[in-house]
């Protein structure tokens, strides 16, 4: 199993373990391991204009989640918060403007927290 397949299995396992939170949260949510290994709830997909979490997941981010989904003016803040979560195990609350599927944008507040699962650290995002 290569690293991409391994990360894919980790995301599936993480989502299964956290499924109740993803389904019941009143907030849009997504978890991020790397650009291609991510999962979201229906609320997050809908917020960005996608019909389902699967449709959002299937977007080819071409190696850059921020370029695909985040307004250029918000990319630095999101990447820095992610790096702090991974390196210093520090959560953050930041303002992020997302790109919508339709071409528009939506302004949000994101609470980002590091969460460990099977020896890997995910960034769990609550979006409102």
Label the model's feature ranges.
Residues 67-97:
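Terminal output helix/cap of sensory domains in signal transduction proteins
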Residues 55-73:
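PAS-family sensory/regulatory domains
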Residues 92-94, 101, 106-110:
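PAS and PAS-like sensory/regulatory domains
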Residues 27-28, 35, 93-94, 111:
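Short loop/turn microsegments at loop-to-beta-strand junctions
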Residues 11-34, 40-42:
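Sensory modules in modular signal-transduction proteins
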Residues 1-17, 128:
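PAS-associated C-terminal cap
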Residues 110-126:
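Short loop/turn elements at sensory-signaling interfaces that couple input to output
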Residues 44-60:
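PAS/PAS-like sensory domain cap-loop motif
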């Amino acid at each position: 199993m290569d690293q991409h397949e391994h990360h894919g299995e980790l995301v599936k396992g993480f989502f299964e373990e956290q499924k109740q939170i993803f389904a019941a949260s009143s907030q849009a949510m997504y978890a991020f391991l790397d650009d291609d290994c991510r999962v979201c709830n229906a609320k997050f997909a809908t917020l960005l204009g996608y019909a389902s979490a699967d449709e959002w997941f299937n977007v080819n981010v071409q190696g850059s989640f921020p370029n695909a989904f985040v307004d250029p003016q918000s990319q630095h803040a999101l990447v820095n918060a992610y790096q702090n979560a991974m390196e210093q195990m520090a959560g953050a609350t930041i303002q992020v403007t997302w790109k919508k599927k339709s071409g528009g944008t939506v302004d949000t507040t994101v609470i980002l927290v590091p969460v460990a699962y099977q020896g890997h650290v995910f960034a769990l995002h609550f979006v409102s």
